[in-house]
């Protein structure tokens, strides 16, 4: 399967010090050897490879997501250059979804003029209201970042910027009330949002995750959020995780790495031009995301031929025996690949969130089946 989503890292530094960050605070520390900012030479090589791949496979629609670190640290000129370079390499008729994923702290009127001019959509990471958000997403000196992020979001929600609004990302903390968090996010009127499980694995379990007790704290949190979202009198926003589970239950295919068995269809390009697998693998071990290839010497098709990438396009065959025997495997898909890791055993075991995912899926399934039976769906 060709690559349809390219994550282009234009900055490897960040203006926040989030304590759950998989890039800076977990097992992999390769960021220390990366350039702080991407160069125009690397941008040119990266966008040329993207265009080459699009042409070779006759793709009609692709996404390029500008990432970091904090990508806005690269500055307005870098954004302008990247946008121009990406569009120059596109074959005629190809639709490009050019987005940036930011913590929102640096968003201001001047930046929005640039973003509007180059049609760069904006996703913002925010974890709920002030108390929820500032548990983790703080500045290096310890000050919370909520006020600055909220200020940027209010600008994003203004009429002249609204068409750029891609959505919100929220990392789950089970200490926070899920309904409070969801409703705090709704205050910014997002067109879409997603709840992300904090990165962890069997060798470094996520907070509050003990498989010995059989408890499912993350499922309970997500179930409360799901029920609040699902039972609203009208759809207040799209929630990707919930919609993907429903889509899979109804026989569809997944469009996210969190659930489902669809082949991986994205690649990361770091600030030095190196190709990498999904960034979340940095939570597993040093070098977990590396493939030893780069935009200067290798095509995107070469990345597709790498054994680690090929193994993630095998669907059910890439999973361990216990997953393949599971009744919800087509929905769960083994969960996020990074969450399956165990030191000395690799990635061929269930997700560290296995019990939570199973509980959540059964709950969503019961709700959807009841509505289908009653004719309310």
Please provide the spans of the model-predicted regions.
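Short acidic/His/Gly/Ser-rich catalytic and metal-binding motifs that mark active-site loops
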Residues: 16-21, 29-30, 130-134, 202-206, ...
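Accessory C-terminal segments flanking Radical SAM cores
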Residues: 243-355, 359
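Canonical Radical SAM [4Fe-4S] cluster-binding loop centered on the CxxxCxxC motif
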Residues: 2-41
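Radical SAM enzyme [4Fe-4S]-AdoMet core and its adjacent flexible, acidic
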Residues: 136-147, 154, 158-275, 280-292
């Amino acid at each position: 399967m060709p690559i349809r989503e390219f994550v282009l890292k234009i900055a490897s530094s960040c203006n926040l010090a989030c304590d759950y960050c998989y890039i800076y605070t977990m097992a992999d520390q390769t960021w220390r050897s990366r350039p702080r900012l991407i160069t125009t030479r690397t941008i040119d090589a990266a966008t040329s490879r993207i265009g080459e791949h699009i042409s070779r496979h006759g793709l009609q629609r692709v996404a390029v997501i500008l990432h970091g670190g904090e990508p806005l640290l690269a500055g307005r000129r870098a954004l302008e250059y990247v946008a121009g370079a990406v569009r120059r390499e596109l074959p005629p008729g190809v639709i490009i979804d050019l987005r940036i994923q930011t913590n929102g702290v640096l968003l201001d009127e001047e930046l929005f003029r640039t973003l509007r001019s180059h049609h760069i959509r904006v996703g913002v990471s925010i974890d709920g209201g002030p108390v929820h958000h500032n548990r983790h997403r703080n500045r290096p000196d310890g000050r919370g970042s909520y006020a600055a992020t909220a200020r940027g979001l209010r600008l994003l929600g203004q009429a002249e910027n609204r068409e750029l609004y891609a959505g919100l990302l929220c990392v789950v903390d089970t200490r926070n009330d899920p309904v409070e968090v969801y409703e705090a996010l709704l205050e910014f009127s997002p067109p879409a949002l997603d709840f992300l499980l904090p990165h962890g694995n069997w060798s470094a379990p996520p907070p509050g995750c003990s498989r010995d007790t059989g408890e499912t704290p993350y499922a309970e949190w997500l179930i409360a959020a799901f029920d609040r979202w699902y039972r609203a009198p009208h759809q207040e926003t799209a929630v990707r995780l919930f919609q993907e589970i429903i889509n899979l239950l109804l026989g569809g295919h997944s469009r996210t790495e969190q659930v489902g068995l669809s082949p991986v269809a994205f690649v990361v390009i770091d600030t030095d031009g190196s190709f990498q697998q999904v960034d979340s693998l940095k939570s597993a071990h040093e070098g977990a995301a590396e493939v030893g290839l780069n935009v200067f010497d290798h095509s995107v098709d070469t990345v597709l031929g790498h054994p680690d990438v090929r193994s993630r396009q095998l669907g059910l065959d890439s999973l361990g025996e216990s997953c393949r025997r599971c009744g919800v495997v087509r929905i769960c898909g083994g969960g996020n690949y990074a969450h399956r890791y165990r030191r000395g055993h690799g990635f061929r075991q269930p997700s560290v969130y296995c019990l939570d995912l199973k509980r959540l899926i059964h709950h969503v399934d019961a709700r959807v089946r009841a509505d289908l039976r009653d004719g309310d769906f």
